[in-house]
UniProtKB/Swiss-Prot annotation:
Residues 1-55, 75-165, 188-343, 1144-1174 are annotated as: Disordered. Its main location: membrane. ATP binds at G438, Q439, T440, G441, A442, G443, K444, T445. It comes from Dictyostelium discoideum (Social amoeba). This is Kinesin-related protein 9. It is a single-pass membrane protein. GO terms for biological process: centrosome cycle; cytoskeleton-dependent intracellular transport; maintenance of centrosome location; microtubule depolymerization; microtubule-based movement; mitotic cell cycle. Residues 724-1026 form a coiled coil. Residues 26-55, 122-165, 194-209, 216-238, 254-325 have a biased composition (Low complexity). The chain crosses the membrane at residues 1183-1203. Pfam families: Kinesin. Residues 350-719 form the Kinesin motor domain. Belongs to the TRAFAC class myosin-kinesin ATPase superfamily. Kinesin family.
Length: 1222
């Protein structure tokens, strides 16, 4: 039961330098600054008082809002009543919190430089208790606190004024004088010791002995009965605003300053079994948000934990034992004053691994000796495996964990140190994972508590007593908790105990608040991974192979059953049903070995009905199946397959750990169903604790498996999670934050208006120099302020030493009181002089505050300039986007043109190929015609040679003349035809050359276009690659400028602008280069196209001339043909008339001869003449036929040549048109 239910967090316990005891080494990532108190060598006790030290660090502080700066500067706005001395201390400490983001040197911190032992201690007062070196966290909405930083209703939000320090110092000095007068009066009446309060060892004094106390003290003294109290003028300071992170890594709430004493005392006893303190600070005080659990059984720190005392097991007396119990006991006691660090924190943290050893089994006790020995270090965090003999070749090994538990550790103590501190985190909205790992039979299921009741009892034996539990479920107090503790079997592990405490915690929170204000909803789900298939054990019969889906937050199992439970009895009934469905089999090392991975998930929903805020959290309790070599299994193939699947999933889990430790970009979660389900525990947002279960046997075969488990646990500690609080804020809270932000914006606008009225705008070029000047001026002012503060501290120390001097003088001799009174009078005069000095210092301090305010205003102006530059960068980004889009559109158009040109070029190539094929066909036909003409000419020559004599004899002179003329014309025609054919052939050759040139030019142009296309593609790719990098650089620079100081803001701004300008210039240059390349290529193409056009015009003119020539030839041929036909007809008619005349003459001669009685002679002559006439007519007919064939062939050749010429001209004209269009 909590003694303090307010919003205070338990303070840290300081470190005491002691010469005895071992030192516990903490494995936490970072340790807070704690105070140290030196003990005198002579054994005398001295009072320890020191000034407060706010660990600011070397970096600068930044106010998140203007109101926080006003709160820090205007100390009159603090609503909590306090004394003038406390106001003085607050005003002095306010100088530690400079306005705006102007960097402060480390010397600005208040520290007692003369006494190094006082630098890291805090002020001690009877008013409040604050934690050392802690930072306040965000306040919880469920608790109400008197926070000094939230009550500023009386202060003006626009006027920032400095504190009237002189009045505070005067009041403070008046209090000192009045106190000194009381001291003099008390010493004069011999009652000096009775008037001053003395600190005795009763547990109620902050400076009490370390043997007592409740864990809320700040400092611990040596063993003395009395100590000198600290002066009443030293009070604890109020914590800075929650927006100022003075220290990193502590989860504590805002501290409030009250005038009443809030220290509570509890007399705790020390349990010194094995030399380990079991009643140190409670782990929950470091882990919980504002809770302080003062149960005596839970006061063990997670980094300074010891094994709970338990009787020595009876198995130690068995003969043949190779591992004695004393090997696992600490050699020396652990120092109780060592630093206590929490196992879990709110920032990025590593997985915490603990190791638990189980006692040896009967089979392990009969094993022979080994060359290695396993021991636990005195700090209870290290495990050493050393060779027993120097001759062995094995090397010594050491493993470090957060805590190592010995075999005699009980279930209750193990849970109190590992599981119980996590309950508050679960209730407050953090995901928690507890995972048990180890070899088969190492005690994983026993540690988590998945087994049955005590001894041979089962869950039914506990369910029979559920009626008593339900009746006492809503009672509170130590008696009821003791009754519930007696109900729980001692052999039960973490799972039932943490569920029980969760319900108790829920009922406690519901009882502390108004009825029906907080509502809890608890649901459970139970999954089993068996042979890479997920089973839902809460469903009837267990659903086989449930689907795992990928969501925004990771992997989810949407089809899994979630059963709602309202009491601990409901949980037990579900668990009884679940355990029957688990896959359990017998192995060599375990009679009931878990052959599957069990994942028990508890989802908790906390609803604040008044504030309308919900908090969700998940609890993972994972019982991993034991890894075992397949060669050691004697069984069927199904058991071998089970072992292979178990080893495969554990290997995948090791791969995930390896990826996380190496910070690789891709983590192999998808290699196994187990790694998918445990994504939140390894690398997610949960607080994860890995329990490495091992055997305590020293046999070599067992130690080999133990080393494997220890290596896995040590590697798992390198994985870092980022725990986050799952809180959903209501609309009203978000609206309130929005209103505050709007108010801040309005204040900023007003400041901007004032700055614009009072001073001009600084140009961007001189911003950097102006910032450096402001920084130098601020550093000088800070140095002056440091000197003033040192003087003030020295004066305060001198004033605080006065009553001590009176006490010492009173102890030595009462007669020296008069001298002391005189000294007091002198001190009064000195104080008056000091007051004057302090007034002067206060005036200087006020001036420095005004200058700082001016610098703050200038910084606001610089911030505005930064916003303007960000807007300009955004405009540049938009311009770059437009340029990219335009270039993309132009490139797309060029691509379309290129594709069209390529398609047309391919079509033309195909046409040219078809024309060439046709041309070759025509050429072949022409060759055949020429060949046939040659054959006919040969025949004609033969005929001419054979029948030339007969023709000459038959033809008359006129016939011979006509034939000669016709033959000459025919010869001339032949010559013309041959010349025309030669010209046509030459023209074809020239045209072929021109076609080849056009093709070569076409190929060159296609290559040029392809190169242009590749260049355009590369440019677009470069633009697409460079544009997001520019945007990311701008965003990163904006983020860095927001988090850095004013100097770094301006330098980063200039650098980012220069980089943007350089990149923009590069892009413009690249664009210009591409444009020039494109323009040059286009010009060259256009020139080539002009040349092609000119060539086409020349070719067209030549073709026109050829056409005219062909037409003239056609006309001449037609005329010649018509003349030839006419001549042929005349020749035919002449020949016919001649033949008729000859026939008539011959007939007349024959008649005459017949009449003259020479019948025989006349018959011979008639036969010879008729035969000769018949032969001449046949020869003339053949010659005419041959001539007609030649003329027809000539016309055919001319027609073929004209068609080929027309086709070539059409192809060239189309190609020229294509190039013109491109």
């Amino acid at each position: 039961m909590d003694n303090n239910n307010n919003n205070f967090s338990t303070p840290k316990q300081p470190t005491i330098n002691s010469t005895t005891g071992g030192q516990l080494r903490s494995r936490s990532n970072s340790s807070p600054s704690t105070s140290s108190i030196s003990t005198p060598r002579n054994g005398s006790t001295t009072a320890t008082t020191s000034s407060i030290t706010n660990s600011i660090g070397k970096g600068s502080l930044v106010f998140s809002t203007m109101e926080n700066a006003k709160k820090t500067l205007n100390m009159d706005s603090l609503s909590t009543p306090m004394s003038q001395s406390s106001k003085k201390r607050l005003s002095m400490n306010s100088s530690l919190l400079p306005p705006s983001s102007i960097p402060l040197p480390p010397s600005q911190q208040l520290s007692a430089k003369k006494d190094p032992s006082k630098r890291h201690s805090s002020f001690i007062s009877t008013t409040t208790t604050t934690s050392l070196g802690s930072r306040p966290s965000t306040p919880q909405p469920n608790h109400t606190t008197n926070n000094n930083n939230n009550n500023n209703n009386g202060s003006n939000g626009n006027n920032v004024t400095s504190t009237n320090i002189s009045s505070m110092l005067e009041s403070n000095n008046s209090e000192i004088l009045s106190q000194n007068q009381k001291v003099t009066l008390s010493t004069s009446s011999n009652t000096a010791f009775s008037s001053l309060p003395s600190s005795t060892n009763n547990g109620n004094n902050p400076l009490s002995n370390s043997g007592g106390g409740n864990g809320n003290h700040h400092l611990v003294n040596s063993n003395s009965s009395t100590s000198t109290p600290s002066p009443t003028m030293f009070i604890s300071t109020t914590s800075p605003p929650p927006e100022l992170s003075l220290m990193e890594g502590f989860n504590q709430h805002n501290l409030t300053t009250t005038t009443t004493t809030t220290t509570t005392t509890t007399n705790n006893t020390l349990n010194t079994s094995n030399g380990i303190n079991s009643n140190s600070l409670s782990p929950s005080s470091h882990l919980n948000n504002g809770s302080n659990n003062n149960n005596n059984n839970n006061h063990l720190n997670l980094n300074n934990r010891s094994s709970s005392p338990s009787p020595t097991p009876s198995s130690s007396s068995i003969s043949g034992r190779r591992t004695p119990i004393q090997n696992f006991n600490s050699v020396g006691g652990v120092n109780i004053t060592s630093k206590t660090q929490p196992l879990f924190s709110d920032r990025e943290e590593s997985i915490q691994a603990v190791c638990r050893f189980r006692p040896e089994t009967a089979a392990e006790q009969t094993l022979g000796p080994s060359e290695k020995q396993l021991t636990i270090g005195t700090d209870q965090t290290t495990i050493h495996i050393t060779p027993t003999s120097s001759s062995s070749s094995s090397m010594a090994q050491a493993f470090r964990f957060s805590k190592v538990y010995q075999p005699n550790t009980t279930q209750e103590s193990f849970y109190n140190e590992v599981g119980k501190p996590l309950i508050d985190n679960i209730v407050n909205g953090y995901n928690v994972g507890i995972i048990a790992y180890g070899q088969t039979g190492a005690g994983k299921t026993f540690s988590l508590g998945f087994s049955g009741g005590e001894g041979n009892d089962s869950y039914n034996s506990y369910c029979n007593r559920s009626e008593f539990y339900n009746n006492s479920h809503y009672l509170y107090g130590s008696q009821q908790q003791q009754q519930q503790q007696q109900l729980l079997p001692s052999s039960w592990g973490i799972m039932p105990r943490i569920i029980k405490d969760l319900f108790i915690k829920q009922d406690e929170q519901q009882s502390m608040n108004t009825p029906q204000r907080i509502k809890f909803t608890t649901k459970i789900s139970y999954l089993e991974v068996y042979k890479e298939k997920v089973y839902d054990l809460l469903s009837e019969g267990g659903v086989n192979d449930i689907e795992i889906r990928m969501a925004d937050g990771g992997f989810i199992v949407p089809d899994a059953v979630q059963s709602s439970i309202q009491t601990f009895t409901d949980f037990l009934t579900h668990l009884q049903h679940i355990e029957k469905n688990r896959k359990i089999a017998e192995t060599k090392k375990n009679m009931a070995s878990s052959r599957s991975h069990a994942i028990f998930i508890v989802s908790l929903l906390k609803e604040d009905l008044e504030n309308k805020m919900t908090v969700t959290s998940l609890l993972y309790l994972v019982d991993l199946a034991g890894s075992e070599s397949a060669s050691k299994i004697d069984g069927t193939t199904s058991k071998i397959e089970e072992t292979k699947s178990i080893n495969k999933s554990l290997y995948a889990l090791g791969g995930v750990i390896e990826d996380m430790s190496k910070n690789s970009k891709h983590v192999r979660y998808r290699d196994s169903k187990l790694t998918q389900l445990l994504q939140q525990c390894f690398g997610g947002n949960s607080k994860t604790c890995l329990i490495v279960n091992c055997s305590s046997s020293n046999h070599e075969s067992v130690i080999r498996e133990t080393i494997q488990s220890l290596n896995f646990g040590q590697r798992a500690q390198s994985v870092k999670n980022k725990p986050l609080q799952n809180v959903e804020e209501s609309h009203s809270e978000l609206k309130a934050k929005l209103r505050e932000l709007n108010k801040d914006i309005e204040t900023y606008k007003k400041f901007i208006e004032k700055i614009s009225i009072n001073s001009g705008v600084i140009p961007p070029s001189s911003v950097a120099t102006y910032i450096t000047q402001l920084q130098n001026a601020c550093e000088e002012l800070k140095k002056k302020n440091d000197r003033l503060q040192e003087d003030i501290i020295n004066l305060e120390e001198e004033n605080s030493d006065l009553p001590k001097k009176f006490n010492v003088l009173n102890k030595n001799n009462v007669s020296q009181i008069e001298i002391l009174t005189q000294e007091l009078e002198l001190s009064k005069q000195i104080n008056q002089e000091q007051l004057l000095k302090i007034e002067q210092y206060s005036q200087k301090y006020q001036a420095t505050n005004e200058e700082i305010q001016k610098s703050f205003n200038h910084r606001q102006q610089l911030v505005n300039d930064l916003h303007d530059s960000n807007e300009k960068s955004k405009q540049l980004e938009l311009k770059l986007k437009d340029a990219l889009l335009n270039s993309k559109s132009e490139s797309d158009e060029i691509r379309l043109k290129l594709t069209k040109a390529l398609e047309e070029s391919t079509d033309k190539d195909q046409r040219i190929n078809t024309l060439e094929s046709n041309k070759q066909k025509w050429k072949s036909k022409c060759n055949e015609v020429v060949r046939q003409s040659k054959e006919l000419q040969d025949r004609l020559n033969i005929l001419q040679s054979t029948y030339s004599n007969s023709v000459d004899s038959l033809s008359n002179s006129s016939l011979n003349n006509n034939n000669n003329e016709s033959l000459e014309e025919i010869k001339k025609l032949k010559l013309n035809i041959s010349s025309l054919t030669n010209q046509h052939i030459e023209r074809e050759k020239s045209l072929q050359k021109e076609i080849d040139l056009a093709r070569s030019k076409h190929t060159e142009q296609t290559l040029i276009l392809k190169n242009l296309k590749t260049q355009i593609d590369t440019l677009t790719n470069k633009l697409e690659i460079q544009f997001p990098t520019i945007v990311n650089n701008n965003q990163q620079q904006q983020q860095s400028t927001q988090s850095s100081s004013s100097s770094s803001i301006e330098s980063n701004l200039i650098i980012s602008m220069n980089t943007i300008e350089v990149l923009f210039e590069k892009i413009c240059k690249n664009q210009e280069q591409t444009n020039t390349i494109i323009s040059t290529n286009v010009e060259s193409i256009m020139g080539k196209l002009v040349e092609i056009d000119e060539n086409e015009e020349f070719i067209r003119k030549e073709k026109d001339r050829e056409r005219e020539r062909a037409e003239n030839l056609k006309n001449t041929l037609e005329d010649a043909q018509s003349n030839f036909l006419k001549q042929q007809e005349e020749i035919k008619q002449f020949i016919e008339t001649q033949l008729k005349n000859k026939n008539n003459i011959n007939n007349n001669n024959n008649i005459k001869n017949n009449n003259n009685n020479n019948k025989l002679k006349s018959k011979k002559v008639g036969s010879s003449s008729s035969s000769s006439s018949n032969i001449g007519s046949s020869i003339c007919i053949n010659i005419l036929f041959f001539l007609i064939i030649l003329v027809i062939l000539f016309f055919l050749m001319v027609a073929v040549g004209l068609t080929i010429q027309n086709q070539d001209y059409n192809s060239q004209y189309r190609s020229s048109y294509f190039f013109k269009t491109t």
